[in-house]
Amino acid sequence: MKRNVIRRNEMLGATLELGGTPITLDEYATTGLLAVAIGPRGNGKTNAGLLMAEQLSAQGWVSVLIDPEAELESLYGDAVADPEMLRNALAKRDQPILVVNATDAGEFVPYGRAILDVADQYRKPIFVVIDEGQLFSASRKRSNGIGEAADIINEFAERGRKHALDLFITALRYTGTLQRTLFANKNLTLIGWQEDPTAWSALAPQFKASKIEFADLNALTPGQFFCLSRHGVEKIRMPMAEALKAVAPKAKPVAKALPATFNEWSRAMERIPTERLAALDEDVVKLLSAVAELSAQQVLAGQAALQDELETRT
């Protein structure tokens, strides 16, 4: 069967607004989109996937939400009953968002095959969101259906471009949780708050040119990410997906924290006149640090940033 060379025309002019500079998808037209969100639980990874699904569904994609917790039906309607129902819905394209309940890799496999079959047959834009990615893809484990599920997800990643199939998947860590194929092919990365310093050795190469350090990741709050895209690296605060807004509890305002890292102090000092910075001698710094109840690490980072800023201005 002859096919025309696929052209991702839906990418041209499409955008993602994730809380920072809008990401234009024109530059992804030749590669497709493979997004990975990395961070511990409660970091906002699921919301990121739902936000992207809502935005892409409004721009011509059909989004398929793989839900291992059976929570998303209350937000987006009843889940499809079986793989055949998913096939039919993807072929008709009359529902912008479809929910698939799959509690483990074994349950995911027939739905994954259905997605691949429809993508290969019709080649119309589909966006798959896989929450709790470690349940369906593992770096080593192959038992209990994970091997077959991982192979299907790898095919999403490796052949998705030619089938108009785009992917978002979550990971708890940068190593040891997902097949390396996904990290090798990713082109949009969201890295959230990190508490484990041993994870930094794997993450550090991502930030080599941006001077971002582990302390910067450790200072992130839920919903904040460093976004690595074709446009570079940007710190963003992810908006809440529309469906979540209706059910999310009202958050209490959090008092603004003082800078904790060299980069945060440096950014804060950029806006302070030179004469005021020059007046911050050792005694003044000690007094202000005591009043603000700064930690020793905050004081050291602030002193280093102050010295660097003054040297830069002279």
For each feature predicted by the language model, list its residue ranges:
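Short hydrophobic/aromatic beta-strand immediately N-terminal to the Walker A/P-loop
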Residues: 35-38, 64, 99
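Short, glycine/polar-rich helix-capping loops at beta-to-alpha or helix-loop-helix junctions
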Residues: 72-75, 85, 174-181
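P-loop/Walker A phosphate-binding loop and immediately adjacent motor/lid segment at beta-alpha junctions
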Residues: 201-230
